[in-house]
Every structure is written in structure tokens, then in C-alpha cells.
Amino acid sequence: MTEAKVEVYYSLQSDYCYFLLDRLLQLSQRQVAIVIQPILGGVLRLPERFKDRDELEQNYFLTDAARAADFFGLPYAPPNPSPITFKPGSLWVAEDEQPLNEYLYRLFVGSTRAGYGLEFLDKVGRMLWDGSTPDWDQGDNLKDKMREAGLDLEAILSSTSWENAKQTLDQNAAGILEAGHWGVPLMVFEEEPFYGQDRFDHLLWRMKRRAVL
């Protein structure tokens, strides 16, 4: 059986990425290399695509996300605070300044470069979305979760400036389009894109057809 690799474009702002996380961890235990590609949320990466979305779409999105979490048996609550700061009165329009998001993505990119992308998502990424830690940005919450992932927060910050992390994020913003879609989560296996957590079973099917599972 040939060792396989799956690239995953993953945004910390996406609940659907969180819904996929446990399945990625399970797949990584099956001699499959999961290569995490950190990517900014769509409202920052593709603001023109999101600026005119309306309340009908937003309301369905909220319904679907809660249903998906229930279906997978996952604890779920939107991050408090949101990593992305939105303009008052808007649905999906971000402010120009994003200090919290930039700080978080320095940790994400730095952890991925250190070879701990999945571990970071399992601890820090999960904390953002499982409702366990309101005010996740306060105190030692991030430091403690980084430690649980085998990472040192201060060392990662020291080695990963925002300007440095942004270079990787810009490369991944181009890479996801080259791979075949703009949305997350996007899984890529042998240059074939699988968009959305609900395409995970299609990914497994393809890998079995290629005799790598």
C-alpha cells in the first residue's frame, strides 16, 4: 500500500473546518500524511465575494452549522471573541485592523512550520469552537493549549512575525485557487480537490480506489 498525502486548506474562522478536524486526526493514524495549509477566513481573503451576502444566507448558515455539530456529536459554539473583528452592523464585512486574528495566525503558521499543524488544531483550534473557553484570548488559555500540543507559545511568536506569516498565507491564498476552489475546508489528494467537510467520504472513496487506504 502506497503512502498517501492529503493537503488541507484550513481556516481558524471556519466552523466547518472544526467539524472536519476529528476525521483528519483519524485519517492521520492510517499512514496518511495530512499537510495543513493555514489560510485566512474568506472575509479577509476574498472580501468582495462576501460583502453582499444577506440575512437569509446567514440564517441558513447558522442553522446548518448547529445541525452539523449535532450530527457529528461535537460540542459547538462560535468563538468568543471572534478572531475576526467585523464592522458594526454588517454580516460578513471585516474591519481593516485585525490584531487578534494576526496574533492567532502567527501561532497557527509557526506551529505548522514546526511540524505541529494537526496538534495545534487539535488543541487551540478545537478550543476556539467547542464552547469550552469563553474569553479564549485571555490569561494563559492559549499558552496552556499550545503546551498541550507540544509547543512553546513564546518561541513560536519569536520565530514568526506577522509579516513573515503573511507571506505563507498569501502563498496559500494563491495555492487554494490553483488547487480548484476558494472555500474551506479544501482537501487535495493527487491534485484532485474536495471542497467541504461533507466531501470527506468522497475523499476516502477516491483514496480506496487508488489503493492507498
Provide a role label for each language-model segment.
Residues 10-11, 55:
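Short, charged/polar micro-motifs that form catalytic or ligand-binding hotspots
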Residues 4-5, 11-32, 121-213:
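C-terminal cap of thioredoxin/glutaredoxin-like
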Residues 18-128:
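Structural alpha/beta surface segment adjacent to cysteine/selenocysteine redox centers
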